[in-house]
Amino acid sequence: EGSGGSGSSGNFTTGSNVRMSSVTNTSNAGTGTSAGDNSAGGNGSGNSNSAPAVTVTLTESLLNK
């Protein structure tokens, strides 16, 4: 799938990788995925989620470039 589409699929694969790493850091799969979709919810749920939320924003800015 990754090789199939170098453009859009490439962005999705990187995004999924970031979300997976954030989930491992939070050690909560359920909250990790929901926090990834809603950054505000992640910050409100707990301090541990605020750290990966920052990394997600940084990766998103790089993807936008």
From Swiss-Prot:
PTM section of the record: Phosphorylated with a circadian rhythmicity, probably by the double-time protein (dbt). Phosphorylation could be implicated in the stability of per monomer and in the formation of heterodimer per-tim.
Cite the entry's keywords alphabetically.
Answer: Biological rhythms, Cytoplasm, Nucleus, Phosphoprotein, Repeat
What are the Low complexity biased-composition ranges?
29-38
- GO BP terms in the entry: rhythmic process
Per UniProt, the ranges with Polar residues bias are: 18-28, 56-65
Q: How does it assemble?
A: Forms a heterodimer with timeless (TIM); the complex then translocates into the nucleus.
The protein's organism comes out as: Drosophila mojavensis (Fruit fly)
Ranges for the region named Disordered are 1-65
Q: Does the keyword Oxidoreductase apply?
A: no
The name of this protein is: Period circadian protein
Recorded GO CC terms: nucleus; perinuclear region of cytoplasm
Where are the membrane-spanning stretches? none
Q: Does the keyword Metal-binding apply?
A: no
List localization entries: Nucleus; Cytoplasm, Perinuclear region
Q: What does this protein do?
A: Essential for biological clock functions. Determines the period length of circadian and ultradian rhythms; an increase in PER dosage leads to shortened circadian rhythms and a decrease leads to lengthened circadian rhythms. Essential for the circadian rhythmicity of locomotor activity, eclosion behavior, and for the rhythmic component of the male courtship song that originates in the thoracic nervous system. The biological cycle depends on the rhythmic formation and nuclear localization of the TIM-PER complex. Light induces the degradation of TIM, which promotes elimination of PER.
